[in-house]
Amino acid sequence: MARRLQDELSAFFFEYDTPRMVLVRNKKVGVIFRLIQLVVLVYVIGWVFVYEKGYQTSSDLISSVSVKLKGLAVTQLQGLGPQVWDVADYVFPAHGDSSFVVMTNFIVTPQQTQGHCAENPEGGICQDDSGCTPGKAERKAQGIRTGNCVPFNGTVKTCEIFGWCPVEVDDKIPSPALLREAENFTLFIKNSISFPRFKVNRRNLVEEVNGTYMKKCLYHKIQHPLCPVFNLGYVVRESGQDFRSLAEKGGVVGITIDWKCDLDWHVRHCKPIYQFHGLYGEKNLSPGFNFRFARHFVQNGTNRRHLFKVFGIHFDILVDGKAGKFDIIPTMTTIGSGIGIFGVATVLCDLLLLHILPKRHYYKQKKFKYAEDMGPGEGEHDPVATSSTLGLQENMRTS
């Protein structure tokens, strides 16, 4: 064992490998070698240089988004009467940024006041007062329990609560959606971006978009791909969803603005591409999107509110992109990497030549030569022994 370790250490410290060129005339190996080189060449030029633009340096963007909506809807509900809904009523938040909700449906509980009333059955069914612990609130409770068990209707008793009364009953969602006119609402998106590395600024209001064009255009992916005014119904359909079913229970839609800019060309060719995605599946564990808000007012000296459970479409505007421009450093790096990849052809052909072909032992004999230090002067009388010509006394050690 010690002898073997000594031999290994001796070989590691006192042996040296140097490449040896051998010209092999073999059609199979020659064809495979050139085919591999061709594949590498196509990869380097086609994929790395042309598609991935390996000759460019890149910059990420910083972005700002603002939106405006337009449209009106009318409802006629008991307790509220006829009502016109404009953008100040159905958009949350009202100032409009990259994430907002358009209300399309709702359940209203009008004229609520602070007082005592029976809890909703979801908040706690009871048989007598012993089932209602005073001061306690269940997970779905709408108030604080008083400790009394009172009739909710003719068949069910629930715990009495102190809270906003009457309690909300939200088990019947209006169908069709109350604000179905939302399908025809329009959305105007303003997007400003900057590529700080190249000091380039752009807006989605590009050169082709002017005041006259904006007054009459609506976005269409083929006819008007640069128009920044969108029909909500079109956006939802392009996301792969049905507007009417989405409007009833709500949902989430993503709008992606993609900037892929080649700054080796004029900056006017840097234009946005819009894409639309449905972010919630219909078979989700918790489908739809909803939240609550209240309108507070004072009537006859009493604080009152209208409670709304809102179902709406949550729009998220996501901006992504990258700009590239020629740079000598990544160009030389890519060229060097490509040249290095050509070595794969040599490795694979050596593997084929020395380990797979029937004459592999013969090729190994021609490929590798073992030379040992024989001391000063030894072997100098035989110039053939130091020759690198194939076929002339190459097996010095074994002959």
Curated annotation (Swiss-Prot):
A Gene Ontology biological process term: positive regulation of calcium ion import across plasma membrane
Residues annotated for CTP binding in this entry: 68, 70, 140, 186, 290, 292, 309
The keyword Transmembrane belongs to this UniProt entry's keyword annotation: yes
Record-listed ATP binding positions: 70, 186, 286, 290, 292, 309
Topology in the lipid bilayer: Multi-pass membrane protein
Alphabetically ordered keywords of this record: Apoptosis, ATP-binding, Cell membrane, Disulfide bond, Glycoprotein, Ion channel, Ion transport, Ligand-gated ion channel, Membrane, Nucleotide-binding, Phosphoprotein, Receptor, Transmembrane, Transmembrane helix, Transport
Biased composition (Polar residues): 385-399
Activity-regulation annotation: Activated by low concentrations of ATP (<1 uM). Undergoes rapid desensitisation. Sensitives to the ATP agonist:alpha/beta-methylene-ATP. Modulated by cholesterol.
Catalysed reactions, as listed in the record: Ca(2+)(in) = Ca(2+)(out); K(+)(in) = K(+)(out); Na(+)(in) = Na(+)(out)
Keyword presence, Glycoprotein: yes
Stated name of the protein: P2X purinoceptor 1
